[in-house]
């Protein structure tokens, strides 16, 4: 498949998925003020960010950097904005929703560089942003969770990021594995799961490109214990009805064995993407997010 064919296929998926799940009435009622930004970072990236700001931002406020899901090929959605506005209101903090670059146009490691770059920028410019550098949170969902993990692994060498805590949920940690190999023998007979796994494989191939997927920045489960031991306190949520469940939980165990303070929770009834999609279990997840964040602010 040529790059042009990959891009055409990705654009078809994006056109179906991007908007429409949050009603215009609900969007109009979302709290705070949204500002679209382009941030130039020290590592040479120019990153698209949507800032969600409360009506009154307290001095030395917290900053939450949110990294959305979408299989590395889909961008920010109205569901992501709703999630960010909800966190902004509950925590009375500044939120940057990072609309990082997408595959296949920009394959690995471009999104990793952007994710690390925007986090580094936030710490370097905390004073002018009016936020407390000791109250910066990294939060990632699905593909975004992979990028948060990659930023933390990269930080094991640079030591420039000091997040007070991180959230990673229902995220891919091993891009060397064919998604269909994660299915049980029973699920391999189910057309729904077979089709879903084939789609995931396509997304992974678009993201990895010609790179070695065994690199820790691509497959965080491959990181050594020394790198993992540098992670801040983590909240890791898995979805009981997600074929990434076991991988997500395996990564939580690796962090625990490396000495990291990890709060891990499985939401049994949940499917992939449940937090931002607001499918069963999302209220429990959102409450867990807010409780964990408040404990670290």
Model-predicted segments: where are they?
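Generic N-terminal low-complexity/basic-hydrophobic segments
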Residues: 1-11
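Alpha/beta-hydrolase superfamily serine-hydrolase fold, recognizing
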Residues: 7, 21-29, 33-297
């Amino acid at each position: 498949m040529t790059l042009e064919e990959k891009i055409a296929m990705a654009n078809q998926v994006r056109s179906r998925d991007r908007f429409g799940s949050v009603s215009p009435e609900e969007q109009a009622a979302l709290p705070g003020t949204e500002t679209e930004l382009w941030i130039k970072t020290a590592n040479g990236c120019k990153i698209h960010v949507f800032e969600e700001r409360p009506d009154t931002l307290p001095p030395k406020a917290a900053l939450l950097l949110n990294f959305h899901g979408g299989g590395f090929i889909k961008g920010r959605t109205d569901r992501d904005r709703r999630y960010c506005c909800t966190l902004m209101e509950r925590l009375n903090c500044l939120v940057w929703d990072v609309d990082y670059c997408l595959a296949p146009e920009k394959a690995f490691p471009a999104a990793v560089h952007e994710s690390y770059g925007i986090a580094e920028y936030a710490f370097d410019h905390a004073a002018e942003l009016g936020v407390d550098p000791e109250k910066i949170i990294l939060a990632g969902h699905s593909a975004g969770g992979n990028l948060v993990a990659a930023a933390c692994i990269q930080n094991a060498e640079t030591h420039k990021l000091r997040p007070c805590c991180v959230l990673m949920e229902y995220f891919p940690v091993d891009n060397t594995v064919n998604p269909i190999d994660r299915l049980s023998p029973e699920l391999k007979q189910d057309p729904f799961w077979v089709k879903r796994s084939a789609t995931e494989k396509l997304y992974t191939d678009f993201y990895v490109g010609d790179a070695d997927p065994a690199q820790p920045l691509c497959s965080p489960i491959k990181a050594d214990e020394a790198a993992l031991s540098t992670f801040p306190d983590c909240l890791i949520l898995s979805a009981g009805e997600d074929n990434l469940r076991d991988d997500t939980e395996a990564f939580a165990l690796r962090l625990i064995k490396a000495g990291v303070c990890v709060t891990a929770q499985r939401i049994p009834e949940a499917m992939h993407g449940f937090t931002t999609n607001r499918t069963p279990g999302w209220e429990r997840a959102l409450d867990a997010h807010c409780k964990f964040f408040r404990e670290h602010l």
